[in-house]
Regions:
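Alpha-helical lid/collar subdomain of P-loop NTPases
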Residues: 1-18, 35, 202-207, 211-309
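AAA+ P-loop NTPase catalytic core and its hallmark functional loops
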Residues: 1-223
Protein backbone atom coordinates (compact mmCIF):
# COMPACT_ATOMS: atom_id res chain seq x y z
CA UNK A 1 0.00 0.00 0.00
CA UNK A 2 2.84 2.38 0.83
CA UNK A 3 4.14 2.11 -2.73
CA UNK A 4 0.85 1.73 -4.58
CA UNK A 5 1.69 -1.75 -5.87
CA UNK A 6 0.20 -5.16 -5.11
CA UNK A 7 2.92 -7.25 -3.46
CA UNK A 8 3.11 -9.27 -0.26
CA UNK A 9 6.50 -8.60 1.34
CA UNK A 10 7.56 -7.62 4.84
CA UNK A 11 10.21 -4.91 4.74
CA UNK A 12 11.91 -3.48 7.83
CA UNK A 13 11.64 0.27 8.34
CA UNK A 14 12.81 2.84 10.86
CA UNK A 15 10.25 4.54 13.10
CA UNK A 16 12.01 7.89 12.93
CA UNK A 17 13.86 9.72 10.20
CA UNK A 18 17.30 11.35 10.33
CA UNK A 19 19.14 14.04 8.38
CA UNK A 20 20.19 11.53 5.71
CA UNK A 21 16.66 10.27 4.98
CA UNK A 22 15.50 11.69 1.60
CA UNK A 23 12.42 13.91 1.50
CA UNK A 24 9.20 12.17 0.40
CA UNK A 25 7.83 13.23 -2.98
CA UNK A 26 4.06 12.60 -2.62
CA UNK A 27 3.57 12.72 -6.42
CA UNK A 28 6.10 9.96 -7.14
CA UNK A 29 4.78 6.96 -9.11
CA UNK A 30 6.50 3.63 -8.44
CA UNK A 31 7.32 1.10 -11.15
CA UNK A 32 6.24 -2.31 -9.85
CA UNK A 33 9.20 -4.46 -10.96
CA UNK A 34 11.84 -1.91 -9.98
CA UNK A 35 10.19 -1.32 -6.59
CA UNK A 36 10.07 -5.07 -5.95
CA UNK A 37 13.82 -5.33 -6.67
CA UNK A 38 14.66 -2.38 -4.39
CA UNK A 39 12.46 -3.68 -1.55
CA UNK A 40 14.17 -7.08 -1.81
CA UNK A 41 17.47 -5.24 -1.43
CA UNK A 42 16.30 -3.54 1.76
CA UNK A 43 14.52 -6.58 3.23
CA UNK A 44 17.04 -9.30 2.38
CA UNK A 45 20.33 -7.38 2.08
CA UNK A 46 20.60 -8.01 -1.65
CA UNK A 47 23.02 -5.97 -3.79
CA UNK A 48 20.73 -4.27 -6.34
CA UNK A 49 21.74 -2.57 -9.58
CA UNK A 50 19.21 -0.61 -11.64
CA UNK A 51 20.05 -0.18 -15.30
CA UNK A 52 18.24 2.01 -17.80
CA UNK A 53 18.28 5.04 -20.08
CA UNK A 54 19.02 8.50 -18.72
CA UNK A 55 16.22 10.47 -17.13
CA UNK A 56 14.06 7.47 -16.22
CA UNK A 57 14.39 8.11 -12.46
CA UNK A 58 16.67 5.25 -11.40
CA UNK A 59 18.34 7.01 -8.46
CA UNK A 60 15.13 8.82 -7.49
CA UNK A 61 13.35 5.46 -7.35
CA UNK A 62 15.80 4.17 -4.73
CA UNK A 63 15.61 7.45 -2.80
CA UNK A 64 11.81 7.46 -2.71
CA UNK A 65 11.67 3.86 -1.45
CA UNK A 66 14.25 4.77 1.23
CA UNK A 67 12.26 7.89 2.15
CA UNK A 68 9.14 5.85 2.88
CA UNK A 69 11.15 3.40 4.99
CA UNK A 70 12.89 6.25 6.90
CA UNK A 71 16.14 4.62 5.78
CA UNK A 72 19.15 6.98 5.56
CA UNK A 73 20.41 7.15 1.98
CA UNK A 74 23.69 8.53 0.59
CA UNK A 75 24.35 8.94 -3.13
CA UNK A 76 27.89 8.93 -4.56
CA UNK A 77 28.40 9.89 -8.19
CA UNK A 78 31.20 7.73 -9.63
CA UNK A 79 32.56 10.34 -12.01
CA UNK A 80 36.17 10.26 -13.19
CA UNK A 81 37.27 12.52 -10.31
CA UNK A 82 36.15 10.16 -7.53
CA UNK A 83 39.29 8.37 -6.40
CA UNK A 84 40.20 5.47 -4.13
CA UNK A 85 41.24 8.01 -1.46
CA UNK A 86 37.79 9.64 -1.55
CA UNK A 87 36.15 6.28 -0.88
CA UNK A 88 38.53 4.85 1.73
CA UNK A 89 40.05 7.93 3.38
CA UNK A 90 43.46 9.52 3.84
CA UNK A 91 45.89 10.89 6.38
CA UNK A 92 45.35 14.57 7.12
CA UNK A 93 47.34 17.06 9.19
CA UNK A 94 45.22 18.46 12.02
CA UNK A 95 45.85 20.80 14.96
CA UNK A 96 45.47 19.25 18.39
CA UNK A 97 46.49 21.07 21.59
CA UNK A 98 48.37 23.56 19.45
CA UNK A 99 50.40 20.84 17.74
CA UNK A 100 50.22 19.53 14.21
CA UNK A 101 49.57 15.81 14.09
CA UNK A 102 48.72 13.36 11.32
CA UNK A 103 45.29 11.78 11.68
CA UNK A 104 43.39 9.35 9.46
CA UNK A 105 40.18 10.81 8.05
CA UNK A 106 37.89 8.03 6.88
CA UNK A 107 36.21 8.27 3.48
CA UNK A 108 32.54 7.85 2.65
CA UNK A 109 32.71 4.04 2.34
CA UNK A 110 33.98 3.21 5.87
CA UNK A 111 31.63 5.86 7.26
CA UNK A 112 28.59 4.29 5.54
CA UNK A 113 29.62 0.68 6.27
CA UNK A 114 29.44 1.32 10.01
CA UNK A 115 25.95 2.81 9.88
CA UNK A 116 22.39 1.83 8.89
CA UNK A 117 22.74 3.57 5.53
CA UNK A 118 21.65 2.72 1.99
CA UNK A 119 24.58 3.70 -0.21
CA UNK A 120 23.83 4.38 -3.88
CA UNK A 121 26.60 4.46 -6.47
CA UNK A 122 25.34 6.59 -9.36
CA UNK A 123 26.81 6.24 -12.88
CA UNK A 124 28.33 2.93 -11.80
CA UNK A 125 29.54 2.15 -15.32
CA UNK A 126 31.62 5.37 -15.39
CA UNK A 127 33.76 4.52 -12.35
CA UNK A 128 37.54 4.27 -12.56
CA UNK A 129 39.05 0.75 -12.36
CA UNK A 130 40.91 1.44 -9.08
CA UNK A 131 37.66 2.67 -7.52
CA UNK A 132 35.70 -0.33 -8.80
CA UNK A 133 38.06 -2.79 -7.14
CA UNK A 134 37.59 -1.02 -3.79
CA UNK A 135 33.82 -1.42 -4.20
CA UNK A 136 34.27 -5.07 -5.16
CA UNK A 137 35.54 -5.78 -1.63
CA UNK A 138 32.20 -4.87 -0.05
CA UNK A 139 29.87 -6.39 -2.65
CA UNK A 140 29.62 -9.67 -0.79
CA UNK A 141 26.83 -9.68 1.80
CA UNK A 142 29.35 -9.99 4.65
CA UNK A 143 31.68 -7.69 2.70
CA UNK A 144 34.31 -6.64 5.22
CA UNK A 145 36.51 -3.69 4.28
CA UNK A 146 40.20 -3.99 5.16
CA UNK A 147 42.02 -0.70 5.70
CA UNK A 148 45.66 -1.69 5.17
CA UNK A 149 47.03 1.69 6.31
CA UNK A 150 45.18 1.36 9.62
CA UNK A 151 45.56 -2.40 10.16
CA UNK A 152 41.81 -2.38 10.63
CA UNK A 153 38.93 -4.52 9.36
CA UNK A 154 35.50 -2.85 9.18
CA UNK A 155 32.49 -5.14 9.46
CA UNK A 156 29.33 -3.82 7.78
CA UNK A 157 26.40 -2.72 9.96
CA UNK A 158 23.50 -5.18 9.84
CA UNK A 159 21.36 -2.51 8.12
CA UNK A 160 23.96 -1.27 5.64
CA UNK A 161 22.63 -1.66 2.08
CA UNK A 162 24.30 -1.19 -1.30
CA UNK A 163 22.68 -0.09 -4.57
CA UNK A 164 23.94 1.15 -7.93
CA UNK A 165 22.52 2.76 -11.06
CA UNK A 166 23.97 2.59 -14.55
CA UNK A 167 23.05 3.45 -18.12
CA UNK A 168 24.65 0.31 -19.53
CA UNK A 169 24.69 -3.16 -18.03
CA UNK A 170 28.46 -3.43 -17.75
CA UNK A 171 29.08 -4.48 -21.35
CA UNK A 172 30.02 -1.02 -22.64
CA UNK A 173 28.05 1.47 -24.74
CA UNK A 174 27.18 0.57 -28.33
CA UNK A 175 24.74 3.45 -28.91
CA UNK A 176 27.10 6.42 -28.63
CA UNK A 177 24.74 8.01 -26.07
CA UNK A 178 26.90 7.47 -23.02
CA UNK A 179 30.46 8.67 -23.52
CA UNK A 180 32.68 7.94 -20.54
CA UNK A 181 31.06 4.63 -19.66
CA UNK A 182 33.14 1.48 -19.84
CA UNK A 183 32.92 -2.25 -19.58
CA UNK A 184 32.73 -3.59 -16.05
CA UNK A 185 34.72 -6.59 -14.85
CA UNK A 186 32.32 -9.54 -15.11
CA UNK A 187 33.57 -10.97 -11.81
CA UNK A 188 32.26 -7.77 -10.26
CA UNK A 189 28.95 -7.84 -12.16
CA UNK A 190 28.50 -11.38 -10.85
CA UNK A 191 28.45 -10.02 -7.29
CA UNK A 192 25.32 -7.92 -7.92
CA UNK A 193 22.56 -10.28 -6.82
CA UNK A 194 19.65 -8.39 -8.46
CA UNK A 195 19.79 -6.37 -11.68
CA UNK A 196 16.58 -4.50 -12.54
CA UNK A 197 15.85 -2.59 -15.74
CA UNK A 198 13.99 0.72 -15.61
CA UNK A 199 13.34 2.12 -19.06
CA UNK A 200 10.64 4.29 -20.56
CA UNK A 201 7.14 4.10 -19.11
CA UNK A 202 3.79 3.53 -20.77
CA UNK A 203 2.11 6.63 -22.26
CA UNK A 204 -0.52 6.62 -19.50
CA UNK A 205 2.03 6.35 -16.66
CA UNK A 206 4.30 9.01 -18.14
CA UNK A 207 1.33 11.36 -18.64
CA UNK A 208 0.20 10.85 -15.03
CA UNK A 209 3.70 11.51 -13.68
CA UNK A 210 4.08 14.76 -15.63
CA UNK A 211 0.58 15.93 -14.62
CA UNK A 212 1.52 15.27 -10.98
CA UNK A 213 4.87 17.07 -11.33
CA UNK A 214 3.40 20.08 -13.17
CA UNK A 215 -0.06 20.64 -11.61
CA UNK A 216 -0.74 23.62 -13.91
CA UNK A 217 -1.35 21.08 -16.70
CA UNK A 218 -3.55 18.76 -14.63
CA UNK A 219 -6.84 19.63 -16.35
CA UNK A 220 -8.51 18.48 -19.58
CA UNK A 221 -6.70 20.99 -21.83
CA UNK A 222 -3.39 20.57 -20.01
CA UNK A 223 -3.53 16.78 -20.26
CA UNK A 224 -4.01 17.06 -24.03
CA UNK A 225 -0.77 19.05 -24.19
CA UNK A 226 1.02 16.55 -21.95
CA UNK A 227 -0.18 13.64 -24.11
CA UNK A 228 1.17 15.45 -27.17
CA UNK A 229 4.52 15.98 -25.39
CA UNK A 230 4.71 12.29 -24.46
CA UNK A 231 3.78 11.30 -28.05
CA UNK A 232 6.58 13.59 -29.28
CA UNK A 233 9.03 11.98 -26.84
CA UNK A 234 8.01 8.51 -28.07
CA UNK A 235 8.61 9.57 -31.68
CA UNK A 236 12.15 10.67 -30.74
CA UNK A 237 12.73 7.30 -29.06
CA UNK A 238 11.47 5.40 -32.11
CA UNK A 239 13.54 7.65 -34.38
CA UNK A 240 16.63 6.95 -32.29
CA UNK A 241 16.10 3.18 -32.44
CA UNK A 242 15.62 3.44 -36.22
CA UNK A 243 18.84 5.47 -36.54
CA UNK A 244 17.10 8.63 -37.82
CA UNK A 245 18.19 10.87 -34.93
CA UNK A 246 20.94 10.71 -32.30
CA UNK A 247 19.22 12.42 -29.32
CA UNK A 248 16.20 11.23 -27.35
CA UNK A 249 13.71 12.91 -25.03
CA UNK A 250 13.83 11.25 -21.62
CA UNK A 251 11.00 11.49 -19.07
CA UNK A 252 13.11 14.15 -17.32
CA UNK A 253 13.20 16.15 -20.59
CA UNK A 254 9.41 15.94 -20.92
CA UNK A 255 8.93 17.22 -17.35
CA UNK A 256 11.34 20.09 -18.11
CA UNK A 257 9.42 20.82 -21.33
CA UNK A 258 6.13 21.03 -19.40
CA UNK A 259 7.71 23.27 -16.75
CA UNK A 260 9.18 25.58 -19.42
CA UNK A 261 5.87 25.66 -21.31
CA UNK A 262 4.23 26.86 -18.10
CA UNK A 263 6.93 29.54 -17.64
CA UNK A 264 6.83 30.85 -21.23
CA UNK A 265 3.17 30.17 -22.00
CA UNK A 266 4.29 28.84 -25.39
CA UNK A 267 4.89 25.12 -26.03
CA UNK A 268 6.65 25.81 -29.35
CA UNK A 269 9.26 28.10 -27.77
CA UNK A 270 9.60 25.79 -24.75
CA UNK A 271 10.33 22.84 -27.07
CA UNK A 272 13.02 24.80 -28.88
CA UNK A 273 14.88 25.89 -25.74
CA UNK A 274 14.35 22.60 -23.88
CA UNK A 275 15.30 20.07 -26.54
CA UNK A 276 15.63 21.26 -30.14
CA UNK A 277 18.57 23.60 -29.54
CA UNK A 278 20.75 20.80 -28.19
CA UNK A 279 20.13 18.54 -31.18
CA UNK A 280 22.26 18.20 -34.30
CA UNK A 281 21.24 20.92 -36.77
CA UNK A 282 20.99 18.34 -39.56
CA UNK A 283 18.37 16.43 -37.55
CA UNK A 284 16.20 19.44 -36.69
CA UNK A 285 13.89 19.12 -39.74
CA UNK A 286 13.04 15.56 -38.60
CA UNK A 287 12.29 16.82 -35.08
CA UNK A 288 10.20 19.67 -36.53
CA UNK A 289 8.18 17.06 -38.42
CA UNK A 290 7.66 15.08 -35.18
CA UNK A 291 6.48 18.29 -33.49
CA UNK A 292 4.05 19.09 -36.32
CA UNK A 293 2.57 15.57 -36.18
CA UNK A 294 1.96 15.81 -32.41
CA UNK A 295 0.89 19.44 -31.99
CA UNK A 296 -0.60 20.17 -35.43
CA UNK A 297 1.48 23.31 -35.94
CA UNK A 298 4.76 24.16 -37.63
CA UNK A 299 7.85 25.32 -35.79
CA UNK A 300 9.21 28.73 -36.92
CA UNK A 301 11.42 28.44 -40.01
CA UNK A 302 14.44 30.05 -38.33
CA UNK A 303 14.41 27.38 -35.60
CA UNK A 304 14.82 24.59 -38.15
CA UNK A 305 16.95 25.79 -41.02
CA UNK A 306 20.69 25.27 -40.90
CA UNK A 307 22.75 28.31 -41.84
CA UNK A 308 25.29 27.32 -44.49
CA UNK A 309 28.18 29.74 -44.72
Amino acid sequence: ETFGIDIDMEVPAFSQGSEHVPAIDPTYRFDRDTTLAILAGFAHNRRVMIQGYHGTGKSTHIEQVAARLNWPCVRVNLDSHISRIDLIGKDAIVLRDGKQITEFREGILPWALKRPVAMVFDEYDAGRPDVMFVIQRVLEVDGKLTLLDQNKVIHPHSHFRLFATSNTVGLGDTTGLYHGTQQINQAQMDRWSIIATLNYLSVEDETNIIAAKVPAFDDAEGRQKIEAMVALANLTRQGFVAGDISTVMSPRTVITLAENAKIFGDVSYAFRVTFLNRCDEVERPILAEYYQRCFGEELPEEAINVMVR
